Amino acid sequence: MQEIESLHQSVLLQEVLQAFTPLEEGVLIDCTLGLGGHSKALLSQKPHLKLIGIDKDKFAQEIAKERLKAFEGRYNLLSGGFAKRFKEALETHNKEIKGVLVDLGVSSLQLDDDNRGFNFHSHTLDMRMDLKSDLNAQKVINSYPVVALEKIFRDYGEIKEYKKIAHKIAERRAKKPFKDAKDLSDFLSSLSKNKKIHPATLVFQAVRIEVNSELEELKEFLQCARNLKGAILCVISFHSLEDALVKNAFKDYAKNCICDPSSFQCTCSNNHALGAILTKKPITPSPEEIKNNRRSRSAKMRVFQFKP
């Protein structure tokens, strides 16, 4: 456990604590509990706060449970996708919920585990957050039709040469299926000379999003979050696709006028805002945090305060 404490660094930890400063009691939902770093800090700082922690990774949840031992009786951990579990919690605890945290990053424990398939050197091609899920990265890469690969590379990886890469993968797998993440990573490296980022980065991102239905789950969550009352919602994203969804959802929450944009005059009474955006621009890690934890460099945090 001491090793986990030293290796795991929660992204934007001080900024998260600052965002939830007004919270003194009630329930906080950590929708992506991970190893429990943010939750542990919040429970330590706020003795009257209770926690509902959600994660689909059973292994990570076991570690989080051990780390939260000192707060026995103040937390309840749930397994499963966060959109579904959040909706259930909202139905039963709506008046008690004072804060909601969503950290959309992959934990260092998952990234560094060669048996999970998230990193370029893994000896599996998996990428599942939920190990009970039927779909894994190997099925996507070795079985998806070329048209489907093109779509996920274009939409989830924002890859310019999405057609070329999809066709090259199809040509290669017809001769010899990809056996693990290293095999795929080495192959992608042979196709590109891009030195700014590893050639496999965007393909791995796209496949991971597909395997875990990440954007669909985020959309479902953001739609459900509209029903929050008096709560602070804090979302940390790690790439432009996630951040755009969060940014647009927050703008939508803050709209006073809900008339058709083509209308010449407002007829809706112009008072429909669900609350206020607390971050005009996203909060990003300090240079010092990036220096200490390079994986934090793409993090962006947005915060919204819902009306009671």
Curated annotation (Swiss-Prot):
Location within or outside the cell: Cytoplasm
Q: What EC number(s) has UniProt assigned to this enzyme?
A: 2.1.1.199
* Sequence similarity: Belongs to the methyltransferase superfamily. RsmH family.
UniProt cross-references to SUPFAM superfamilies, sorted A to Z:
Putative methyltransferase TM0872, insert domain (SSF81799), S-adenosyl-L-methionine-dependent methyltransferases (SSF53335)
Coarse class of the primary localization is cytoplasm
Protein name, entry field: Ribosomal RNA small subunit methyltransferase H
Record's function text:
Specifically methylates the N4 position of cytidine in position 1402 (C1402) of 16S rRNA.
**Reaction(s) catalyzed by this protein?**
cytidine(1402) in 16S rRNA + S-adenosyl-L-methionine = N(4)-methylcytidine(1402) in 16S rRNA + S-adenosyl-L-homocysteine + H(+)
Which residues does the record give as S-adenosyl-L-methionine binding sites? Answer: 36-38, 55, 86, 103, 110
Query: Which source organism?
Result: Helicobacter pylori (strain HPAG1)
Q: Where is the signal peptide?
A: none
Q: Which InterPro entries match?
A: RsmH (IPR002903), SAM-dep_MeTrfase_MraW_recog (IPR023397), SAM-dependent_MTases_sf (IPR029063)
UniProt keyword annotations, A-Z: Cytoplasm, Methyltransferase, rRNA processing, S-adenosyl-L-methionine, Transferase
The record's section on PANTHER family has: 12S RRNA N4-METHYLCYTIDINE METHYLTRANSFERASE, S-ADENOSYL-METHYLTRANSFERASE MRAW
Q: Does the keyword Cytoplasm apply?
A: yes
Keyword S-adenosyl-L-methionine (UniProt)? yes
